[in-house]
Amino acid sequence: MSAQPSVFNTPYRAFLFDMDGTILTSIAAAERVWTQWAVRHGVDVETFLPTIHGARAIDSIKRLALPGVDAEAEAAWITEAEIEDVEGVEEVTGAAQFLKSLPAHQWAIVTSAPRTLALRRMAAAGIPEPDVMVTAEDVSVGKPDPAGYRLAAQRLGVEINDCLVFEDATVGILAAEAAGADLLVVTATHDEPIETEHATLAGYELVEAHLGEQGLSLRTI
């Protein structure tokens, strides 16, 4: 946990969560599929894999600008392959219990994954399905664009600047910043320390949610 205390004990109208790397870990499964895809298309795996995390599949493919490649068809292939491979997908420690403790109308998931893939991974990890979930199909532009987080706040009926976003990846952090939300960086799945001005959280077993008259707040245990 970082020494930056500003988001702790601060009341919010809602908590917004990224999915992969924030409430569940699917890095190994995703990298297995993307490695297979990259090799098939002659893309350097070592340099490419770090760029996929937190981004929509179609955006990762379009960014490469490969000649003769149908980005939509390739993204659909990626999604189907990832739906089939959920080996090793599991919750970030304490995430499921923490999410279950939240009022249903005060939290949402905002993910770059398509809805079918998101639900598959959540089921594999034991993550509860929220009333509000923004997925790849819901926005025309993915993270780092802030549209997903703004849409989640809108669907919950709250202002985005009254929300706390839980994120792990650079593109998601940029999206939350651009949206105007407060931010907590979840570091549970990071192999290397992250340099950030935002508060950090190593795992959900270290915190609990408190519902008061002014809103939902995060407290350290």
Model-derived features: where do they sit?
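N-terminal helical cap/lid subdomain that shapes the substrate entry/recognition surface
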Residues: 5-103, 114-116
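Asp-based, Mg2+/Mn2+-dependent phosphohydrolase catalytic module
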Residues: 2-13, 96, 106, 115-221
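Hydrophobic residues in well-ordered beta-strands that form the structural core
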Residues: 25, 109-111, 185
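Residue-level marker of regulatory loop/turn positions in helix-turn-helix DNA-binding domains and
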Residues: 91, 110, 141
